[in-house]
């Protein structure tokens, strides 16, 4: 159980890093008016949210 909590903690940290990176990408794309960078930023942002809440999503799926 401790190992599982540790692994999910690491996964959450990676998700938060991706989430922050996605926010920065979206902000930079709005400044430079770059639609492709904006799309990549939103995809990174969405991936970061999914990875951050992976444990909760798995608990919802498995019940």
Q: Which residues does each predicted region cover?
A:
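Hydrophobic alpha-helical segments involved in membrane association or supramolecular assembly
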Residues: 1-63
């Amino acid at each position: 159980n401790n190992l599982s909590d540790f692994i999910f903690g690491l996964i959450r940290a990676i998700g938060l890093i991706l989430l922050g990176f996605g926010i920065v990408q979206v902000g930079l794309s709005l400044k430079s008016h770059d639609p492709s960078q904006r799309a990549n930023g939103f995809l990174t942002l969405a991936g970061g949210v999914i990875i951050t809440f992976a444990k909760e999503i798995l608990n919802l799926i498995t019940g």
